[in-house]
From Swiss-Prot:
Cofactor needs: FMN
SUPFAM superfamilies: FMN-binding split barrel (SSF50475)
Keyword annotations: Flavoprotein, FMN, Oxidoreductase, Pyridoxine biosynthesis
The protein's role, per its UniProt record: Catalyzes the oxidation of either pyridoxine 5'-phosphate (PNP) or pyridoxamine 5'-phosphate (PMP) into pyridoxal 5'-phosphate (PLP).
Residue numbers binding FMN: 64-69, 79-80, 86, 108, 143-144, 188, 198
Catalytic activity, EC: 1.4.3.5
Protein name: Pyridoxine/pyridoxamine 5'-phosphate oxidase
GO biological process, one term: pyridoxine biosynthetic process
Gene Ontology molecular functions: FMN binding; pyridoxamine phosphate oxidase activity
Amino acid sequence: MSKFRSLADIRRDYGELQLSEESAENDPISQFKLWFDDVLLNEKNDPTAMVLSTVDEKGYPDSRVVLLKGLENGNFIFYTNYQSAKAMQIQKNPYAALNFYWPQMARQVRVRGRVKKISSEQSDAYFSSRPIKSQFSAIVSPQSQEILDRISLEDALNQLIEEYGQKPVVRPENWGGYMIIPDEIEFWQGRDNRLHDRIHYYRHGHEWTHRRLAP
């Protein structure tokens, strides 16, 4: 007998948390901040982790986990190499989706919107706040390109550290931040018996409107 359970039999109860139209905030950013405060208290691992989805020139979707590094003026901010695969896809198709999933609270937030680079000043400020070895890694890594092996990458990192010594590290031009300007945000609260709560916010002109969706 296989020691693995059937995938179809894997399930769990989601608990008693709920999301109603009456309790939902009028705008999704306020609702996100409310939930995120709860998440910081209850989620043990990577509460800022989010799946970023983009589309390449052939229409193929790509997804990867990145970290939320800011929520400014209602925009979701992350950082990356501007020559990475995700950056090339954003350049050709400046729209993306985010998916936050917090299993301890059975909560999910989906975001869809436009993508823009943030200012150089913002990227400089964040880059200088990173641990020094993370700064060097951003310089030495040709992200998404083929490399010979890990040892050559580590050798390049060590050489760069030796060359810089105590000098301040300057952010490379090919590294910085993006903001996702949301047009839609959906909040999902897992409920027992699979009758989940879904509240969907969408822009209506300059205002936000929300509605309940069937699970």
